Amino acid sequence: MGEGKLSRRAAGWPSSTDSTVIEMGPGAKGGAGIGDAMPDAVTTHDLMAEYKVPMDVFTYHYYNGISERLESVMPAGHWQASQAHTDDYLAMAGLCARSYAPIRDKYMPGAQMWVTESGDAGGGGNTWGSTYLDVLRTLNELGDFATATDGIIFHNTLASSDYGFLEHGTFNPRPNYWAVLLWNTLMGTTVYDAGVGGHVYCHSRRDGKDGYAYLMVNNDLENTMTVELPGEGTLYALAGRDGMRSSVMTLNGKELIAGAKGELPDLSGVTVSGSVEIAPGSCAFVVV
């Protein structure tokens, strides 16, 4: 009840006179993933009904589940590594966003939604959170979230525990770091209907040129996904160097490892046309 009491007190605070301040809340949890395994002391509707200050951004926290560290405490919230590529697992982030969208629309119509804390699993992340296996979830979360709402996802954390984008102590980039870097480099901010099922997402190009940038997540570990391009495109194919739980990711077959002084590796794509095969368990960006 502590969170609820704090939020109720804050609800009566006067609005800031600083025009640069963004009012946001309520920092909710639930709707899918870890939230479904945690009882609600105060509901999101209860919190929002108390606010007297108009807010600019609707916020919530989201994790896909509970890590191995907390499995014994909250077994219903834990996913096994064997499930981390499944449609059910990958669907959780989008389900959460869509469960909050009607609440946002009721109390803050037109506002963005910000996920102010997110990761693969609460409790430090799963042991595979630092490997290529979690890239499928990370990229699919970005793609699916963008089809549900305009907003921002804040990842927890940069360099701590299993879900850190950087390895603690060495600061060496992990697979998710490169995946998100490529997302931000290639995928623009205008979202289109990809027109197909599965885990395929279509945006404008980040470079501002005419055309489209696609993200394709082939979460089938046995079958290849085949894509027909209308012309030439640029392919950025991602895979685990040594399998799904590899600590090193490859881009078009080349290892993504930072240099001794932190230099970025070559992140260039390769030119493709006609039929493009997306290997089992791999992810790909295609810019056309």
Language model features: what each stretch is:
Residues 112-205:
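Aromatic/acidic polysaccharide-binding cleft in carbohydrate-active enzymes
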Residues 68, 163, 224:
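Glycine/Thr-rich phosphate-binding loops of Rossmann-like dinucleotide-binding domains
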Residues 229-278:
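Acidic, Ser/Thr/Pro-rich beta/coil linker or hinge segments at domain junctions
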Residues 47-50, 98-106, 110-113, 121-133, ...:
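Mature, folded catalytic cores of secreted/periplasmic enzymes
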Residues 59, 115, 154, 213-216:
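Structured core elements
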Residues 198-243, 280-287:
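Carbohydrate-binding surface patches
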Residues 1-135, 148:
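Noncatalytic carbohydrate-binding groove/subsite architecture in carbohydrate-active enzymes
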Residues 68-69, 243-248, 286:
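Short, solvent-exposed loop/turn elements at domain surfaces
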